Amino acid sequence: TGKGKVSDYTYAELQQFNLVDRNGNVTTFKIPTLKECLEWSKGKTILNLDIKDVPLEVMADFIETEKPVNVIYTVHNAGQARYYLDRKPDAMFSCWCKNREEFDNYEKAGIPWKQVMAYVGPKMKPEQQPLYDALHRNGVMCMISVAPTHDRAKTETEKTAGYQSEISTRPDVIETDYPYLFQGLDLTK
């Protein structure tokens, strides 16, 4: 219910606001802390921590303190993955892997493929099929994100048409802000 950037407020100041649901209705819920989200999610879901503006050291300290078991860490390069892996050997990753050079960097850094899901971009590209094949040979699922593309369409009809077009390119995982819109779509294409 607030206005402006979250980063312009302290956490205490943010507690005066309530969260709004996807239909624009004000709820009774407040903005939770990451620790509260981790506690709530235990036994319910897996959280993908894609934290862009927090130093690696801060996240590593948090990981060592909280020891979350239901978390996947989004990393943008092999160095970040190695940093977390050295502190939490069983860490699971969503690794940005959009080309063969990035794939090779993860290999050289010794990141275990069994602990990786690869974010390959906003869509599957035919020219990157050799990369997808290499990932699949290593047991890695390829994930795309429609958040920056089809999720921004104005209507639900436009969103679902975009989703269906991406399904036909055969990604293993589709990240979206609107998972409920996938109900009823043909996921077999």
Give, region by region, the residue ranges found by the protein language model.
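Extracellular/periplasmic catalytic domains that process cell-envelope and extracellular macromolecules
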Residues: 6-8, 39-42, 65-66, 86-88, ...
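An active-site metal/cofactor-coordinating segment within enzyme catalytic domains
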Residues: 1-43
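Sec/Tat-exported extracytoplasmic proteins
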Residues: 18, 41, 63-67, 88, ...
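C-terminal active-site rim and adjoining tail of enzyme catalytic domains
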Residues: 24-28, 96-97, 103-189
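Distinct, well-ordered alpha-helical segments
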Residues: 55-65, 81-95, 99-110
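A mature extracytoplasmic/lumenal domain signature
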Residues: 10, 18, 51-55, 77, ...
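Short, well-ordered coil/turn segments that N-cap beta-strands
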Residues: 42-47, 67-72, 89-91, 114-116, ...
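Conserved, mostly hydrophobic/aromatic
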Residues: 14, 37, 49, 166, ...
